[in-house]
From Swiss-Prot:
Subcellular location(s) of the protein: Cytoplasm
Residues noted as binding GTP in the record, renumbered to the chain: 224-229, 243-249, 268-271
SUPFAM superfamilies found in the cross-reference section: P-loop containing nucleoside triphosphate hydrolases, TrmE connector domain
Binding, K(+): N224, T243, V245, T248
Family: Belongs to the TRAFAC class TrmE-Era-EngA-EngB-Septin-like GTPase superfamily. TrmE GTPase family.
Listed GO biological process terms: tRNA methylation; tRNA wobble uridine modification
InterPro entries the record matches: G_TrmE, GTP-bd, GTP-bd_TrmE_N, GTPase_MnmE, MnmE_dom2, MnmE_helical, P-loop_NTPase, Small_GTP-bd
Keywords: Cytoplasm, GTP-binding, Hydrolase, Magnesium, Metal-binding, Nucleotide-binding, Potassium, tRNA processing
Organism: Alkalilimnicola ehrlichii (strain ATCC BAA-1101 / DSM 17681 / MLHE-1)
Classification of source organism: Bacteria, Pseudomonadati, Pseudomonadota, Gammaproteobacteria, Chromatiales
Cofactor(s) annotated in UniProt: K(+)
Descriptive protein name: tRNA modification GTPase MnmE
């Protein structure tokens, strides 16, 4: 528990009806008595005069006291609810500083809550995600993380990994039993179930990252396929210049939109073709770089042309792809979704709008629309940690099932635990904590 006491304005600065100032730390009882002449009963709002050192009133408002450990930070917390004027707030903060409370750093209240065991790191990050949410779906996902859905799923997986690791290490200690244990089909079953559980968690976290950050979709295809027209149709705005001249789009054009509350970042790119001029070649290079970072690529082509081989355009093979056949109004084909094997395709007309509702429904579906209530908020660092854990779990499986190498398997399982623990903050560094909490608001 911290030895210093901190304070900060918890509401937005400026003029308003009410300003909330938060104080946390061991000096809270003394500060309350010096400021208002008394320490309120825990969790009861009382009307109080907030006075300066000479006894003159600085403001009048409500005061609440939350004793440790049952407070947001796990420390003694005092909350002052006064009038929302800049001068009033400034005078109160200067009085608190004089009484020994230091100005809080951004996110320091949440950091103390984490360090004092009031929440794990996913819950602390969810506070910032909830504040920054720009859609109902992302707000709901952040709330589920704040309630512990993500952290609980990680801890359940860690518990199962730990049990298997204990079994492996016990077998190593009794070398005459090690081979029999490692050869047991039940061990292969356990590690297989762990791999499946981890993959399911990665899938959910990936959806959660999309809900938090938005899905990045790149419009790709040959020149004059209608990429810019489709961007304008999706955004319902003339964002992109559209002409009949091939190669009109030379640079990336980014637009942000919501489809029924689901955040989407759409990037229009230069047409992909051989023998471009020097400027167009740079546009194509940027298009390929954008595709490599995308969550999904929409491969757009004229429906009257033969289906394009993605490999012929050197599209990234590891990025999910949806085919969009444009200009259906110029053909005898029916608009809407179609499927060839595992491939999803949708016929549309960016000009007339037919087929666009089906495309929007498809984008909503791949973003997890309708399932948002079961998702939690996730960040890129979470996905990276889960990927590292999956790599080590695969190595542990090989050591256990194929190589009968118990000591190697035990070490790989330890690394799985460590990487999962980085998500919840069980294993972390001061640099990581500083990076996370520095992005928070002051007063949070």
């Amino acid at each position: 528990m911290a030895r210093t006491t901190i304070c900060a304005l918890a509401t937005p600065p400026g003029r308003g009806g009410v300003a909330v100032i938060r104080v946390s730390g061991p000096a809270v009882p003394a500060i309350a008595r010096a400021l208002a002449g008394r320490l309120p009963e825990p969790r009861r709002a009382v009307l109080a005069r907030f006075c300066d050192a000479g006894g003159d009133t600085l403001d009048e408002g409500l005061m609440l006291y939350f004793p440790a450990p049952r407070s947001f930070t796990g420390e003694d917390v005092l909350e002052l609810q006064g009038h929302g004027g800049e001068v009033v707030v400034d005078r109160l903060l200067r009085r608190l500083h004089a009484l020994g409370a230091h100005p809080a750093r951004p996110g320091e209240f949440s950091e103390r809550a984490f360090l004092n065991g009031r929440m794990d790191l996913t819950q602390a990050e969810a506070i910032a995600d909830l504040i920054a949410a720009d859609s109902e779906a992302s707000a709901q996902a952040a709330l589920r993380s704040l309630e512990g859905a993500f952290g609980d799923a990680v801890r359940e997986l860690v518990a199962r990994v730990t049990r298997l690791r204990v079994q492996v290490e016990a077998a190593i200690d009794f070398s005459d039993e090690e081979i029999d244990f490692l050869a047991d089909e039940a061990v292969a079953g356990q590690i297989g179930a762990l791999i499946d559980q981890l993959q399911a968690l990665r899938d959910k976290a990936g959806q959660g990252r999309v809900l938090r950050d938005g899905m990045q979709v790149v419009l790709a295809g040959p020149p004059n396929a209608g990429k810019s027209s489709l961007l304008n149709a999706l955004t319902e705005d003339d964002s992109a210049i559209v002409t009949e001249v091939p190669g009109t789009t030379r640079d990336l054009l980014r637009e942000h939109l919501h489809i029924d509350g689901m955040p989407l970042h759409v990037i229009d790119t230069a047409g992909l073709r051989d023998d471009p001029d020097r400027i167009e070649a740079e546009g194509i290079r940027r298009a390929r770089a954008a595709m490599a970072e995308a969550d999904r690529v929409l491969l757009i082509q004229d429906i009257r042309e033969p289906p394009i081989d993605p490999a012929a355009l050197a599209l990234p093979g590891d990025i999910p792809l949806t085919r969009v056949y444009n200009k259906v109004d110029l053909s005898d084909e029916a608009p809407g979704p179609r499927r060839a094997g595992d491939e999803v395709a949708i016929a549309v007309s960016a000009l007339t709008g037919v087929g666009l509702p089906a495309l929007r429904d498809h984008l909503k579906s791949v973003m997890g629309y309708g399932e948002a209530g079961s998702h939690f908020s996730a960040r890129r660092r979470h996905l990276d940690a889960l990927a590292r854990a999956a790599d080590h779990l695969a190595l542990a499986r090989r050591a256990l099932v194929e190589e009968m190498a118990g000591e190697i398997a035990a070490e790989e399982l330890r690394l799985v635990q460590h990487n999962l623990g980085e998500i919840t903050g069980e294993f972390t560094s001061e640099d990581l904590l500083g990076e996370i909490f520095s992005s928070f608001c002051i007063g949070k």
